Amino acid sequence: MASDVSSHLLTVTQSRWTIHHMYNKLLILALFTPVILESIIYVSGPQGGNVTLVSNFTSNISARWFRWDGNDSHLICFYKRGEGLSTPYVGLSLSCAANQITIFNLTLNDSGRYGAEGFTRSGENETFLWYNLTVKPKPLETTTASNVTTIVTTTPTVIGTKSNVTGNASLAPQLRAVAGFLNQTPRENNTHLALGEGFVPTMTNPGLYASENYNGNYELTEAANTARTNSSDWVTLGTSASLLRSTETAVNPSNATTVTPQPVEYPAGEVQYQRTKTHYSWMLIIAIILIIFIIICLRAPQKVYDRWKDNKQYGQVFMTDTEL
């Protein structure tokens, strides 16, 4: 019984001594081993602005600041207990201190990883700080237009009879050209364009007739009708009414040039219908040929299969002469 108690006390004493021994070793390691702390700080700044990288170092500590370019590090600041020594990176402008550095005039190339190392008494206590700097691109500047030119076009004014025109008729040549050009065949268009003159179509006004010379003075609200016979004449305003002129001068109908249009063999609508009809006929022929081809392709394998089946079932039949 006594031996059991003594052995138990010895075991407890040994275990306590082991715990104290391990604690002492950890305490000794903690006192003589440098303490290293690492963290990452994310910082961003605008392009062209300034950014400050702040550390938790005190003013009586020495610090080294680095800029990492891939796997290479470049010393950009060395602050030794109140004495700042700056070694700027290429194109890098900054102010250096123990607890912070400020980078001026940020560019997109300044983005990257930076590091700060603080130490006292020859590296006895070291602290590492990592900075991930992101430079945001400068937004594009938009400028408003200060000088804006407004173009005002006046409409022509038509009063009185055919030969009297007042007001600014700057749009008249262009309107005549558009009205006469919309519903014409290519051959007729080429004829009129070769003359270099504007078109004056026959108007739907009941006061005008096909045999009457029309000098082109009409209102913008009237609709033009280009339907005419081969015997009808079109009258242009002569060479003075160019399409590129900004103003129009009223011309005496006696000075007008008469242009006889070329005869039209088929209306445009009928020609278009014939082309469509021919197009559909070709499609119908192609469809019939495809259907016949598909039927032949579907029946051919069936015939081959039937012939093979008959040969397999009955074999070949030979005609023999039994007479001697």
From Swiss-Prot:
GO biological process assignments: symbiont-mediated suppression of host pro-inflammatory cytokine signaling
Principal cellular location given in the protein's record: host cell
SUPFAM superfamilies: Immunoglobulin
Any one cellular-component term (Gene Ontology): host cell plasma membrane
InterPro entries: Ig-like_dom_sf, Ig-like_fold
Protein location: Host cell membrane
Changes after translation: Highly glycosylated.
UniProt name for this protein: Membrane protein UL8
Organism per entry: Human cytomegalovirus (strain AD169) (HHV-5)
Upper taxonomic lineage: Viruses, Duplodnaviria, Heunggongvirae, Peploviricota, Herviviricetes
